[in-house]
């Protein structure tokens, strides 16, 4: 949602895919990159790249002008605001916050994983590319 909306605002979007050591991801970084590439294949101004390390290092290496973060709720803001301050201090990057659309404000990967693990239907919660991978896991 946020990436698609950003594609109308910015001339070029670079989506960085990284492993967050504090989260247990269902899919590998490569699988997540592949799904994102499939989801955005028709968007000429969106490029997906995976990386390791700090976001500011990735952004610097790729001449990124600003970091965009999607926010679902105030709890997201608390964490992302701290990260934005750190990114500004470390490398001078500006962070732009964009709220998710209301229909996605409650949604999280943890919620999708839990619903799916109990056999619930997540068709309306994820893109078809993600649903296909979920059903093959």
Residue spans for each PLM region:
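Nucleotidyltransferase catalytic core that binds NTPs
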Residues: 1-137
């Amino acid at each position: 949602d946020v990436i698609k909306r950003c594609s109308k605002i910015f001339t070029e979007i670079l989506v960085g895919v990284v492993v967050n050591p504090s989260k247990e991801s269902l899919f590998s970084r490569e699988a997540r990159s592949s799904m994102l590439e499939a989801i955005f294949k028709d968007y000429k101004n969106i490029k997906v790249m995976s990386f390791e390390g700090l976001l500011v290092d990735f952004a610097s290496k790729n001449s990124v002008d600003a970091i965009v973060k999607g926010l679902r709720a105030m709890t997201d803001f608390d964490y992302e605001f701290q990260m934005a301050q750190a990114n500004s201090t470390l490398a001078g990057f500006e962070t732009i916050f964009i709220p998710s659309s209301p229909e996605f404000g409650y949604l999280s990967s943890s919620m999708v994983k839990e619903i799916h693990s109990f056999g619930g239907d997540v068709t309306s919660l994820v893109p078809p590319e993600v649903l296909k991978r979920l059903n093959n896991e």
